C-alpha cells in the first residue's frame, strides 16, 4: 500500500532530478567566471551540508569539528599528488577512507559523551588537528601546499581554461551526497539514527545498538566531507591551514 511517506520520497526524488537538470544548463547561459566560481562553491557547500546532515541532522550528534575531515581530504589529495604523484582521484578516495577511519577512532571516546559535552569535544579535536597541520613541516606547515598545475586534464583533475568541469563535478558531488542521504533516510540505518536522535535510551531498549549507529553515521559523514575537501584542494590548487581555521 502506497503511504504518504513513500509518495513524499518519490516527490523529493523527482524535484531533485528536475533541479539538477536545470542546474546543469545554467553554465551555458552564465559566462562570467566569478559567478561560475560562486556556483561551484555553492554546490560544494550543498554537498557538505548533506554530509553534515547525516551525523548531526538524522543522528542528532551536533558536530562542530567537521573542518578536520574537510582538511584531511584536502591535505591527503594535495600531499599524495605533490609528494608521490598519485592522481587526485585516488587521493580523493584515500582521503575519504582515512577520514572515515579517524572519525570512528575519535568517535570511540567522544560518543560516550552527550549534549554540549560532545559538541565541545568536536571543537577541541578540530582545533588540535588545525595545530598539528599548522606545525607539520612536511605538509607545508603554516605556508600550506601549492599544487603544481600540469595542464587541463580530467586524469589529473586540473582545469585552467574553464571552470565548467569543476562545476559539473561539484554538481555531481552535490547530487551524490543528496542521494546517499535520501537513500539512507529510508534504510535501517536511517531509522536507527532517528531513533537515537529522539531518545537514545528508548532506542537501546528496543534493540538499537546506539554506539554502533553513531559510529556508522560518523564514518559516512566524514567520508563525504573529505571528498568535498579533496575537491576544494584541486579547485583552488592549494591548501592552507588558514582556510581550515575559517571553517573551524
Task: Go through each PLM region and give its residues.
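Transmembrane alpha-helices and adjacent helix-loop boundaries
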Residues: 1-242, 246
